[in-house]
């Protein structure tokens, strides 16, 4: 059995890790940590949880002794500091600390420094793109939720060199759980119910992450226009991406079918079939569709994921499975909750 620790177990992504790993056939949870609830049992904090383990303070020596892999679900800068103290343990960070090739970009967007950061020691954890590198990685930077939805939708065209990198417009809509558990009037029921709003327009922290990975896929430095929105639902992301390509709609469809044909979690829909976030609720699945606006010669890509599963904790477990040579869908072969 793989001994697993979760640091930050009482946030939304931490709880989702507990939910998934509790039912994983090859895992034993040996350490749970929470800064806010240290000393309490998890099911005292959340009575619906089936785990009665005590939430502990972070103890690097104890974690190193009792864990083979640790998931960190912590604020920017904190995961990196803790990870450096852990010995002979593999790390999957659900924050941003291990996502960037250039620490200066991270510092610019997150206003944090990562002392002695070595980008060659970590792997960006979008499983479908980097599984071969993930296999032997010690540090994996789990992708952000928006980047996951956008990169999955654009990777085949970018890698094929069939996308005009000069014009990429991304419109994404997310459930409010993507903002985490922090208290804010902006995320209250009275502000969100029956409403839709854009936020962090042109300055969302996921922009440099998307640009980094998209540039690597196409081999050219590119920039995109990204506008995220909050919608009055708990889970789910729907991204609509507008791009230019010389390929016909049928050619794009065949390219995507071939690219993702062997993937267990990525589903390419026929043109004219458009996905709903409800199709992914509580699951690690992603659906991608496409349309062509012949009048403006624009290709429209649409992707949906559950932001807490494929966009966070589910993908983290998928990465763990790859790192430990398990079946990639181990612990993740559950269907979406519908309706």
UniProtKB/Swiss-Prot annotation:
Cellular-component GO terms for this entry: cytoplasm
GO biological process: L-arginine biosynthetic process
Reaction equations catalysed: N-acetyl-L-glutamate 5-semialdehyde + phosphate + NADP(+) = N-acetyl-L-glutamyl 5-phosphate + NADPH + H(+)
Location in the cell: Cytoplasm
Keyword Metal-binding: no
Annotated coiled-coil segments of the chain: none
Single GO MF annotation: NADP+ binding
Enzyme Commission code: 1.2.1.38
Keywords: Amino-acid biosynthesis, Arginine biosynthesis, Cytoplasm, NADP, Oxidoreductase
Pathway: Amino-acid biosynthesis; L-arginine biosynthesis; N(2)-acetyl-L-ornithine from L-glutamate: step 3/4
UniProt superkingdom: Bacteria
Active site per UniProt: 145
Record function comment: Catalyzes the NADPH-dependent reduction of N-acetyl-5-glutamyl phosphate to yield N-acetyl-L-glutamate 5-semialdehyde.
Xref: HAMAP family: ArgC_type1
PANTHER family reported for this sequence: N-ACETYL-GAMMA-GLUTAMYL-PHOSPHATE REDUCTASE, CHLOROPLASTIC-RELATED (PTHR32338:SF10), N-ACETYL-GAMMA-GLUTAMYL-PHOSPHATE REDUCTASE, CHLOROPLASTIC-RELATED-RELATED (PTHR32338)
Family, similarity comment: Belongs to the NAGSA dehydrogenase family. Type 1 subfamily.
Protein name: N-acetyl-gamma-glutamyl-phosphate reductase
Organism: Kosmotoga olearia (strain ATCC BAA-1733 / DSM 21960 / TBF 19.5.1)
Top-level taxonomy: Bacteria, Thermotogati, Thermotogota, Thermotogae, Kosmotogales
